């Protein structure tokens, strides 16, 4: 188990991207020694950055090994295919060919800091929450979500592209957040997270930390049943010198 834990930890990022004009926040906490959640920041050859949040079905050694394969294969496909949707389509084909009896939900945002465009590709995951600087909230790419990865080998994934204006935020998360249970066996729910993100915070870090604190307060003295992962990306508000 320690080996699987070490393998998994090796595939999680040790630092956040240093992209001028952007802030990042991430939180990862497995429910047990080895979790099935995965997130990553992948610098692409053309200056863009891919942000991935995924949830491998299951826990334990097999899930950790599958996550290792997912991580390596995602990096390979993104390095060799510039189109995010095509890269995920190829990633799915490769994972489906493994014929392992598990699948993975994944959402990816490819951020271009030159154009401030964010291209979202969704494979059966919760859509990111997008909060505009004005406080409006939506879930881009929800209607374009495809099947989870590794179920069928001939799925074509569709991209959704939005422009991040100054002050805009994207929040990506796994179902350990919205399905967190309180003592009455009630789920935290996406609506609570939406409301919290919509209210905003002084900084991206504060938003991330207050979101996790709210989920933890909901769980109370109960048990965290599932891995929890939250990743936030924010375009800074431009200040005039």
Residue ranges of each PLM-predicted region?
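C-terminal catalytic subdomain
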Residues: 160-172, 177-241
């Amino acid at each position: 188990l320690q080996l699987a834990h070490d393998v998994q930890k090796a595939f999680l990022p040790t630092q956040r991207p240093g992209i001028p004009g952007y802030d990042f926040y991430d939180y990862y906490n497995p429910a047990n020694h080895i979790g099935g959640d995965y997130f990553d920041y992948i610098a692409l050859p053309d200056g863009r950055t891919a942000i991935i949040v995924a949830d491998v079905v299951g826990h334990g050694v097999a899930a950790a090994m599958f996550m290792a394969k997912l991580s390596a294969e995602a990096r390979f496909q993104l390095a060799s295919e510039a189109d995010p949707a095509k890269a995920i389509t190829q990633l799915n084909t490769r994972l489906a060919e493994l014929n392992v009896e598990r699948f993975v939900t994944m959402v990816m945002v490819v951020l271009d800091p030159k154009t401030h465009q964010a291209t979202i590709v969704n494979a059966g995951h919760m859509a990111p929450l997008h909060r505009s600087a004005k406080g409006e909230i939506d879930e881009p790419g929800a209607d374009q979500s495809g099947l989870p990865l590794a179920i069928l080998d001939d799925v074509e994934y569709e991209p959704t592209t939005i422009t991040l204006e100054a002050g805009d935020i994207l929040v990506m998360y796994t179902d350990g957040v919205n399905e967190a249970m309180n003592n009455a066996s009630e789920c935290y729910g996406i609506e609570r997270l939406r409301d919290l993100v919509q209210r905003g915070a002084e900084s991206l870090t504060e938003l991330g930390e207050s979101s996790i604190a709210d989920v933890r307060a909901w769980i109370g003295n109960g048990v965290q049943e599932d891995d929890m992962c939250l990743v936030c990306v924010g375009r800074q508000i431009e200040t005039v010198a």
